[in-house]
């Protein structure tokens, strides 16, 4: 490049010298092993960078969260739109969590006119308490002697009995007079003045009190004992069986064909089982069988005919 004048040539040379000077200094710093630090840079002169370094006794987490490790974009306030969006979401989520937690109702950040503050007031729920108030115990006087202790228990029993009687009396007064009419399980009592009057219903307590008022030792008082129980009917003795008359026994004589002693044994065995027979006699030689007992001739004949041939003895006339 050719210059038109000497002045322009000198100006060009001076500018080249100025540009070469910082390059030489930078090359010198590069040779020394680092970049030159500009002490007048506003980032270096920031107040947060001038804070003293953390002491070695602090936790490593606090040292890691110090401003020395803060990104450059955050320190310059040049956060990206994505980071701002995430921060807004976190803040909204934190607000919703704070609204749900019971501790947030009592936070000082809630204004006094808001509904959240009014709902968090514990006095708001005083009207909805449905439990009975706890009675305050009354200090009873100390009892030292045994007599005082007995008197104290008697007084308490009298008070309890009076309360019970008052409640029962008030209950009966509220009911109608014929409330217990269907529950009466006793008979009506006649009036003592007029025994022929209509029977009037009286309570058992009233009849008992009327008996107590009368003097048992007075001659007018008559006590009627309960009637004796009716006599039991005499036990009837069982009828005695009729005595057997010996004259009622009948004698039956039969002619039986007996061939041997075996035939006689069969007849004897059969007669022993016959009902009503008291005695019998077998004459083997004459072939004669005599039966005595409460039997009829036809019954004996029919029974023996089952074993052997038999017929009535000719001398006996059938009755």
Curated annotation (Swiss-Prot):
Entries under InterPro entries matching the protein: HMA_dom (IPR006121), HMA_dom_sf (IPR036163), NAKR1-3 (IPR044526)
SUPFAM superfamilies linked: HMA, heavy metal-associated domain
Alphabetical GO biological process terms: flower development; phloem transport; root morphogenesis; sodium ion homeostasis
A GO term from the CC aspect: cytoplasm
Region (Disordered): 1-113, 191-248
Tissues showing expression: Expressed in vascular tissues of cotyledons, rosette leaves and roots in developing seedlings before and during the floral transition. Expressed specifically in the phloem companion cells. Not detected in embryos or seeds. Not detected in the vegetative shoot apex.
CDD domains in the record: HMA (cd00371)
Induction: Circadian-regulation. Up-regulated by CO in leaves in response to long days.
Signal peptide: none
Pfam families from the UniProt entry: HMA (PF00403)
UniProt subcellular location: Cytoplasm; Nucleus; Endoplasmic reticulum
Bias (Low complexity): 14-27, 58-67
Biased composition (Basic and acidic residues): 36-49
Record's compositionally biased regions (Polar residues): 1-13, 104-113, 200-210
Record key words, sorted: Cytoplasm, Endoplasmic reticulum, Metal-binding, Nucleus, Zinc
Top-level taxon: Eukaryota
PROSITE patterns assigned to the protein according to its UniProt record, in alphabetical order: HMA_2 (PS50846)
UniProt binding sites for Zn(2+): 260, 263
Primary location: cytoplasm
Subunit structure: Interacts with FT, but not with TSF (TWIN SISTER OF FT).
Function per UniProt: Required for root meristem maintenance after germination. Involved in phloem translocation, starch accumulation and flowering. Promotes flowering in the photoperiod pathway. Regulates long-distance movement of FT from leaves to the shoot apex through the phloem stream.
Protein name: Protein SODIUM POTASSIUM ROOT DEFECTIVE 1
Source species: Arabidopsis thaliana (Mouse-ear cress)
């Amino acid at each position: 490049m050719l210059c038109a004048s000497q002045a322009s040539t000198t100006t060009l040379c001076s500018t080249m010298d100025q540009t070469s000077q910082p390059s030489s200094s930078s090359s010198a710093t590069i040779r020394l092993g680092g970049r030159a630090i500009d002490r007048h840079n506003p980032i270096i002169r920031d107040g947060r960078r001038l804070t003293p370094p953390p002491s070695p006794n602090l936790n490593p987490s606090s040292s890691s969260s110090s401003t020395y490790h803060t990104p450059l974009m955050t320190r310059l306030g040049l956060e990206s739109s994505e980071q701002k969006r995430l921060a807004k979401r976190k803040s909204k989520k934190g607000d919703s969590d704070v609204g749900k937690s019971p501790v947030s109702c009592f936070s000082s950040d809630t204004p006094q006119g808001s509904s959240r503050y009014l709902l968090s007031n514990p006095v708001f729920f005083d009207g909805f308490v449905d439990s009975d108030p706890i009675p305050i115990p009354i200090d009873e006087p100390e009892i030292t002697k045994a007599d005082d202790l007995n008197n104290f228990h008697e007084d308490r029993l009298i008070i309890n009995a009076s309360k019970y009687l008052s409640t029962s009396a008030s209950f009966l007064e509220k009911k109608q007079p014929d409330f217990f009419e269907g529950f009466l399980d006793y008979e009506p009592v006649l009036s003592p003045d007029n025994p022929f009057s209509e029977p009037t219903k009286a309570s058992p307590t009233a009849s008992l009190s009327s008996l107590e008022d009368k003097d048992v030792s007075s001659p007018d008082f008559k006590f009627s004992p309960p009637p004796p129980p009716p006599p039991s009917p005499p036990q009837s003795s069982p009828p005695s069986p009729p005595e057997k008359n010996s004259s009622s026994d009948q004698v039956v004589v039969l002619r039986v064909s007996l061939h041997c002693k075996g035939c006689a044994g069969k007849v004897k065995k059969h007669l022993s089982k016959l009902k009503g027979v008291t005695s019998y006699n077998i004459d083997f030689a004459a072939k004669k069988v005599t039966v005595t007992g409460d039997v009829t001739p036809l019954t004996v004949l029919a029974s023996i005919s089952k074993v052997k041939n038999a017929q009535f003895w000719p001398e006996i006339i059938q009755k």
